[in-house]
């Protein structure tokens, strides 16, 4: 058992208030810590009978979160507790700090009123996202499932934190082959859609670009309902890729002959974004993964030059 797992029944320590979500590996509850009255998020992970001890996915998540907990833009894992379900099965509770809302709900609140998110708010959220991802990537961690729903935020302070690192995996060079049970389609990088088995931090940067565009327009930029449809949405905006635009693309496993589209201008998809913003977005949404801007370089981009409180974010 991981040394940090405390064998105290979680239900003695916490009062469940409501179910707030269903993660990849288990349910998430808003709960109150009885001793302090503090509100926390409890992520409940079931341990299957056929597994010896704690699932490797959970142990991986715990070790990653412990390592990343130092960063202000990664949701903090406060504790890990063991408990028993009604059926007497062992369950593990990951205790996280609780955040009131997430970027998906935040965008929806603007969309429902027909208003745009203020430019400086978008800048601040994007800077924090790039900063958090630069920290993860700097520690050899890919998120692989970035989307507005797992970017938690405090609406009072506009502090953003990256959550749900359940699918995160430490990457070391050379890149390992990965399974692709990852990512919600809308934020999925084209190399993943095309069946690449070697990928890098660039998959997260594509997702960051999609989130950026969505903050600007209140709508997801590519809304495919299948892997093929998702690719076609991307091709319609950026043109159907070829070997000249993206060397090696035609060797990817899922590559076929696709309809030929000519590129449109990116600014037409994000009409309210200024020139510097469009430039940064275009660097995030490059076809060729090696050409995509890194999170660290994105933080240095002129788009963020007029953000006053960078050092305090």
Curated annotation (Swiss-Prot):
**Alphabetical list of InterPro entries matching this protein:** CDK (IPR050108), Kinase-like_dom_sf (IPR011009), Prot_kinase_dom (IPR000719), Protein_kinase_ATP_BS (IPR017441), Ser/Thr_kinase_AS (IPR008271)
Which GO-annotated molecular functions does the record name?
ATP binding; cyclin-dependent protein serine/threonine kinase activity; protein serine kinase activity; RNA polymerase II CTD heptapeptide repeat kinase activity
Which of UniProt's keywords are assigned here? Acetylation, ATP-binding, Kinase, Nucleotide-binding, Phosphoprotein, Serine/threonine-protein kinase, Transferase
Residue positions of the active site? 145
User: Which residues are listed for ATP binding in this entry?
Assistant: 20-28, 43
Q: Which reaction does it catalyse?
A: L-seryl-[protein] + ATP = O-phospho-L-seryl-[protein] + ADP + H(+); L-threonyl-[protein] + ATP = O-phospho-L-threonyl-[protein] + ADP + H(+); [DNA-directed RNA polymerase] + ATP = phospho-[DNA-directed RNA polymerase] + ADP + H(+)
| Tissue and organ expression note | Expressed in root tips, shoot apical meristem, leaf primordia vascular tissues and tapetum of anthers.
GO CC annotations, alphabetized: cyclin-dependent protein kinase holoenzyme complex
Q: Which GO terms describe its biological process?
A: G2/M transition of mitotic cell cycle; hormone-mediated signaling pathway; regulation of G2/M transition of mitotic cell cycle; regulation of meristem structural organization
Where in the numbering of this chain does the Protein kinase domain appear? Answer: 14-304
Which domain of life does the protein's organism represent?
Eukaryota
Xref: PROSITE patterns: PROTEIN_KINASE_ATP, PROTEIN_KINASE_DOM, PROTEIN_KINASE_ST
- The intrachain disulfides are none
Give its E.C. classification number: 2.7.11.22, 2.7.11.23
Positions of post-translational Phosphothreonine modification: 179
Q: Which Pfam families match?
A: Pkinase
Is the ATP-binding keyword given for this protein?
A: yes
Record text on subunit structure and interactions: Interacts with CYCD4-1 and CKS1.
Similarity-based family:
Belongs to the protein kinase superfamily. CMGC Ser/Thr protein kinase family. CDC2/CDKX subfamily.
Additional comments on file?
A: Protein abundance may be regulated through proteasome-mediated protein degradation.
By what name is this protein known? Answer: Cyclin-dependent kinase B2-1
């Amino acid at each position: 058992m991981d040394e940090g797992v405390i064998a105290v029944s979680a239900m003695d320590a916490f009062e469940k208030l409501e179910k707030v979500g269903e993660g990849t590996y288990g349910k998430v509850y808003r709960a109150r810590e009885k001793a302090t009255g503090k509100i926390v998020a409890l992520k409940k992970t079931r341990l299957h009978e056929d597994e010896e001890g704690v699932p490797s996915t959970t142990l991986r998540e715990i070790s990653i979160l412990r390592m990343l907990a130092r960063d202000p833009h990664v949701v903090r894992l406060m504790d890990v507790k063991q408990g028993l379900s009604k059926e007497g099965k062992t369950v593990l509770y990951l205790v996280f700090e609780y955040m009131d809302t997430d970027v998906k709900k935040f965008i929806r609140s603007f969309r429902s009123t027909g208003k745009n998110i203020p430019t400086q708010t978008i800048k601040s959220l994007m800077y924090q996202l790039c900063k958090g991802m630069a920290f993860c990537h700097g520690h050899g961690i890919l998120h692989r499932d970035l989307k507005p729903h797992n970017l938690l935020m405090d609406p009072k302070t506009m502090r953003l934190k990256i959550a749900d690192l359940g699918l995160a995996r430490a990457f070391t060079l050379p890149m390992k082959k990965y399974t692709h049970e990852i990512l919600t389609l809308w934020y999925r990088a084209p190399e993943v859609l095309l069946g690449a088995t070697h990928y890098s931090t660039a998959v997260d940067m594509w997702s960051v670009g999609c989130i950026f565009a969505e903050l600007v327009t209140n709508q997801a930029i590519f809304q495919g309902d299948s892997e093929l449809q998702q690719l076609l949405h991307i091709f319609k905006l950026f043109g159907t890729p070829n070997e000249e635009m993206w060397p090696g693309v035609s060797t990817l496993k899922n590559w076929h002959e696709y309809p030929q589209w000519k590129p449109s201008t990116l600014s037409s998809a994000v009409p309210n974004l200024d020139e510097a913003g469009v430039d940064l977005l275009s660097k995030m949404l490059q076809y060729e993964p090696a050409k995509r801007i890194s999170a660290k370089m994105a933080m240095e981009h002129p788009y963020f030059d007029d953000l006053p409180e960078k050092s305090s974010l």
